[in-house]
């Protein structure tokens, strides 16, 4: 209704004004003004609107200009807030806006306050944000709205008055009169009458509205602009979070916190459950809340107390008299009092004019009087503190003391002297919270940070500062009453009450009353060496308002005769940093020097000028002769700055004086002056002052370099809160207050004090000040000391860091790093994160001359992920326990010489070498040094003196027995214990030793426990950092970790867990865990099943079913992280033509499709090309984008895996018309064409040198091109062409494929383009581009660091993911090859493997040349020598027969080809082909050993005749037969067997035997896993029974007897002597064969777990796919020695010598036909070679490159007639029994079998019986071979690793015998191709090559007696066709045998056999 009246009045006024423009008179205006409503007494503050009051705006004479001004004012007023007149800038439109509940604002306003807002209103249609939030706040808001309406109407009336006045003046001037003016006057009267009625109705509705409005508007002129968030006229602001503390604002704010708080009207809308009491209850209703009678309290007040309070309420301060909340006006304050504190105030009319006023109740008067008394007491105490400080106290300090005392006095009506009544409030959760956060709550009591001694006036600033240290504190929790508020608004409202109980004080008061153990203050002072006087301030600080009986003190009440509470110690760091830089030019102070310098440059730039090179300071006038001192003076601004000690408020001129002051006064522990100064800073006797207690003495503090406290003492002690609390006083007046301890804590403090009474005080801080050992100058850290010494004492620098290579010492590790890089050539990228060095203990002695008793060196450059992480590499950044090491990882001394009690639990001793370390980090990193040389168990079994200098890491300082209390530390050269075990294991039981070994394993294995990002290969030491990396760098959210079920280890993905399970828990990794995939060998597409792969080959590649099935059988199982097939090289042409040849396919698809854009190499699969490109430096390491889809990847491996899987392209070959290269598709061809600058050549060019092959090529229309790679050269191609020519001449078969190592086609080399080349002298690789060659050389230079032991320790590589590096570990701790997908467990294995990628044959060029020359010179004179040289050449070319072999084959039948041979020898290249091809799959290998192992492991079921290892005699239960030990439990037994398996040698190639069940496994890792599995078996069942062994022995004996009979009857005339000899040998062989003990063949399936599937990468061993001989390097030193093939020296691990039965036969052979000199020579060569093999552990880790190269290197100087290096010589990397015939080189004195038996006679088997049987049978086989030199044993023609080790050698011998008999006649008629090793002839080159491979696989098992028996059987087969037919069924169908060529070779072979038998 009021709105309607207002609208009517407004309309009427507008019409009147429009009608009276020309006739209005002044009298009307005056009368209208007089008739205004009676609201003119209200004054309006228009500051916020930018105008003045309406009264001041009424002119006596107005002009048109003034009218326009009033119109603008009106416009401005109409745009203000409709409800509160807030300025327009803070308003929004009412019409088009909505409230939070989606209700239109106009409706909201009408419903809430009854004001209807319409678009037609003349009043404002704007509303401010504050009013929107207030709409539903409180009922009195309507009053304000009504007042605003009246105010706006008044403005309208004022405007009308001004207008009427203006019109009146005009009418007076114009003489106008009359009627209209009277009419307007009547209208005005009517309008005023309506408004009077409206006001009357409003007053009836709200009788107090008028007075309220008056109160609201009263005092508006006194408005002040404040920073507080008051309501009017400033806008309301949102509640902000706690600000970030800048730590430089030290200006103390007002004690009143209202400046930082918001208007409580924001929080009035509360529910009952949100508060402690009903809303109607008073906040100070003591009867309701605290049980205190307010009336009794008020009665005790002075009579004038209430009057004083009432008078205070009438003061000009607009604040609430109950909660001190300030408001902009007194009216708002009174309204707040009535609404929020209705029970504390009452309306009274006792005013002079009988106006109702609000008066406080007596209860409130009592509370206010308490506060006033407390304030008076605080002021008095502050004055006393100022007097105690001698008047030297700043205003800031004075205010701090006053505030502390006031807070202590604000008891809120709680009786803390009797805390028992509040015990129910202390729930268990609250007590636990107080105990956990004791340190923080203690600081919260005084709002003072303990670290920086900084006081904060408000809760918000204090919490913003301390949350840095206590980030886990909950939000919205009151730390007094521990009430958790639902919202921040409620929390702030709760804080402003300031009347909640302090539970921390209650708990401490209760503890103080129950404490029985009390530490007297006198004892503490005596312990500290301080005087017994008590500071004045401390003594009186706790006495607060003692004259007022109603005041409850919250501080410590101390009797006049008592002492203060013992202050808490202040750490040295806290004292040193507790300073302020004050400017002498202005009163400002700054916390840091940087801020001060910035201030000077900004504000006083004219004063502080730059150095003018004058000796005199331009400001202070001091003279500085030394330019260094002058510049330091200028830079430090010494003449402008003044340092203030914030601990005691002392001012010092220089920083040095400040340091002296802190050391002397605060850390020295003597002098009362410092005590009083300190006491004056903290006030109120709280435990923040100074404390000399536990203060280290100055001398010990200035002790030397890095000696300090343990990390746990130098860091926060929040983990043990009772220890941080201080003991109570000795008196009985111990009252509440922050710091009492429990009985146990007090007792601990007492014992600590007693211990520290005699101990120097250097153990409380780890970063103690340092002193120059030359001049005694003090500095606060070691680096500053070094900086001083470098400038002042450059010739006396300490040699703290010593080089491990040359022993030079340097004071800084950075100098050592530069030395290592510049002098020793260490790659600087390898040492960015870690460095290995020896710390010179002599350089870090203490300043007083004493030597620290534990390791005191600095280890600054240790990566964090090398910390002692114990949960699988996923430990979070927070330390595990309170005593964990500091994050800086400075291994400082944790004690000094006499503090033995504290250091006993902190010393960490190395169990291997007894080096002592101060914490786990030093020990963990030191343990890694032991693990580098060998694994953990070998390190434990090795003595300390076995460590070579290369494995040194940290040298511990020796200590005497008296210092350590233990036996002292052992240096690296200390002798081992007699038992050859570490000292820590000397007195342990076997069970303890087993546990100890396992702990060593786990400790050393920590280097594997790091997480690696599988996308970018970065490593992380914690899950937190890994998650952050994945989120920020790869946008991967919700990273999940796979947790081990057996321990707390977690892994990023499954592979890490698999490896962890295998390595740590010994869990077998099953085949079903490996995803089986089938890869197309043509295009590398992977399929999930074999049928899909075959269908793909048939449809896409047009392969027949036979070829498809053949190729499908070669598909490998590919792991997700390793897409490489085992054994495939990556830098050569790997064409898989064997499958095409097997199927007889003549498909026209080209051989090479993928062309490298950096070199001429090309490949047949995309995968191979991608791997090859990754080896190029030209490959842009920063460009990892897919050219097909545009995806960008983090590394090249990720990119090529993506292309390999996602973009398998269909071949569309395109040939370059210039260079004839064939590309995979047109795009690659188009990319190549612009860069091709070669002349066009045609298929009829100069390269067509072989007519037959060329014709065959054109007939087949095969588009085959061969381009040069690092392994090819022109000479090789010439050699291959000659081979093809000779082959064509010999058999006419020009279409044969697969001749050379499986990657060259029939005529592929005929089209090769000759380009000028340059060869690498290191690896032999050849290049046509000089730039490529230069970058290749750089690779070798970067490989140099591999030989550095530092690199072997730290595997952190260059930061660039694409940068070349070798030792990059993956997440499982394995080293990944950067050229392929293989991983290795040790860096030495990776080193060997990488050489395999870049290997070349240039080292063997001289050997080849000499070998060729020797062959040419001696070919016509000694056929035996020819044979041996052909053995060498055969080895040199791998398995590919060359022209020498062809000529030798011809010479076996005719002597016409000698000249031909010589010419072909002269044209032989100095470089030899190295690729060997598997005949069962498409894999190619670079060494025979790799091929041999491949056959053993992948094709064991495809090869029928494998040499079998001996049957293992199983150990009895809980008994070790080898060691003759018995065990109590199965666990100890298995543990012992595991330890033994790590060092045991294999029984035969790739055959590690299990003594528990007799099973053989192909790898040592599998053996250990197998033994581990026995632990889970209840009963261990052997793989073969005795009955099976006896049956097998009987069968083999019968077969041998039959062979012997056939041999005796089939001897010819020309071999009588041989027949007699063979008869004797055969008889001996038959006798010994009866003793054979081999299990049945039906057991062959027992070990299927060792099939090819186990060779996959995901098996967890990490090296199963290693193609070189280093797969077992990780197994330790012991095995490496065994792998060297050192049997020649008679070293036998089991101590079993060769059987005695062999001697008669050997002697018999020697008497018959042995050249003793030759035999001695052979034996001598073998022994010398074995000596070379035993050179050392490091040499044993070389690659199989050395296997082949070193053989020739050693044999190079030998004459023709001497014995060439035997089979195993030079095989330093091979397992001891892994030998191959093709690796052997002989000069003809001894065939390869003799060398084999030489090797293995001396390496006897563990079991004497087994060894005898094995040797006998092998001798039988060998005898057959040697008695008939022209027949070869094919016993292991295509062998692979057979898990069944049950087929005996006699069985193999039967096969080979039958084979020879079958083919004897055929080979007489057709010489064909002859084997140089055994003179056996074959029809084709393919068969010969397959046969030669059998020599590789057949050799290792031969021994002396078996060789003799084999020779006899072979002699029998020469003439016994019937016997051959009987055994032909056992021979391989496609193996075609031949007969002997001549008698000369037969006799020579017999001699050799005899020689071998004698040995």
Swiss-Prot record:
Residues 1271-1283, 1639-1695, 1716-1758, 1782-1829 have a biased composition (Acidic residues). Zn(2+) binds at residues 81, 84, 128, 131. The modification Phosphothreonine is found at residue 246. Keywords: Coiled coil, Metal-binding, Nucleus, Phosphoprotein, Repeat, Zinc, Zinc-finger. Pfam families: zf-AD, zf-C2H2, zf-C2H2_4, zf-met. One of its GO terms (molecular function) is zinc ion binding. GO terms for biological process: behavioral response to ethanol; negative regulation of adenylate cyclase-activating G protein-coupled receptor signaling pathway; regulation of transcription by RNA polymerase II; response to ethanol; response to heat; response to oxidative stress. It is found in: Nucleus. Disruption phenotype: Flies exhibit defective responses to environmental stressors, such as heat and the free-radical-generating agent paraquat. Its main location: nucleus. Residues 716-727, 741-759, 1445-1467, 1697-1715, 1833-1851, 1942-1952 have a biased composition (Low complexity). A zinc finger (C2H2-type) spans 318-341, 447-469, 581-604, 770-793, 801-824, 908-930, 1011-1034, 1042-1065, 1078-1101, 1154-1176, 1184-1207, 1318-1340, 1375-1397, 1476-1499, 1552-1574, 1873-1895. Residues 178-208, 674-762, 960-991, 1233-1301, 1445-1471, 1627-1865, 1933-1959 are annotated as: Disordered. The modification Phosphoserine is found at residues 228, 680, 832, 894-895, 898-899. One of its GO terms (cellular component) is nucleus. Residues 192-205 have a biased composition (Basic and acidic residues). Residues 1255-1267 have a biased composition (Basic residues). Residues 79-155 form the ZAD domain. Residues 677-693, 1233-1253 have a biased composition (Polar residues). Required for normal development of ethanol tolerance. Relies on two distinct molecular pathways: a cellular stress pathway defined by hang, and a parallel pathway requiring octopamine. Stress, at both the cellular and systemic levels, contributes to drug- and addiction-related behaviors in mammals. Function of hang suggests that this role may be conserved across evolution. This is Zinc finger protein hangover. The lineage of its organism: Eukaryota, Metazoa, Ecdysozoa, Arthropoda, Hexapoda. The gene is hang.
